[in-house]
Amino acid sequence: MHTPETHAQALTYEGATTIGTHIIPEAARLFAARTGLAFGAIGGAGADAGFRAAVEGRATFGGVARELTAQEKAQVAGQVVIGYDVMGVFVHGALPVKALTRAQLKEIFSGRAQNWSLFQGPDRPITVYSERLSGGRATVKAFQSMVLGNEPYGPVRELDDATDCIREVAQDPGGITAASMSFAVPGVAALAIDSAAPTLAAVQGGTYPLKRPLILVTRDLPGGAAKAFLDFMLTPAAQAIVGKLFVPAR
């Protein structure tokens, strides 16, 4: 049994790219400046891989950008929600369709609706882009739960990560993908869902439906440097980092 202090000299992160790209690097730098405790590797292999890395002792922290299952909760002693992500549904910036309902999204992502003309758009085939369905990505699972009701995805073009999906949609007038709003770039537009725009205010007000927790997990009860970092992540300074692109936990 590893003690919590095992990783004290080299804190490491593996897991969701949403957390690993947009939060951990800046938070780790500030934490190191304040405490002298530095991070080693910061990975982005996805939520499932990060969870396994934490449970197997290969990473101090696993990052999961979705709700934990009951089985997962039983495997970890430490879990801290550091914020909430706004999930966006992105289309090409020139597409005239600006809003859809969750029921309409289900028709599209299940493969039952395959042309934008069904949604008052142009007569143009719909191409769904997604991170790899079998890759253990939090976005894939969260969207499947919140929009598809855990039914299977229809035909999709599978890519390695959210950045790739967004890049393809920016170049494809018929493309659509689900991803964290933190990955938004010029050339794409995020749809309003159920009449609510994907803004932090709409999530905080409860009108925008696609919201998910950002969680750091540890196998053992955190102590030493691990506990210090988790405590730090809930301080105003760290929550300000979270708040740049996400909804802070505090």
Where are these regions (language model features)?
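Exported/periplasmic ABC-transporter solute-binding proteins
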Residues: 1-250
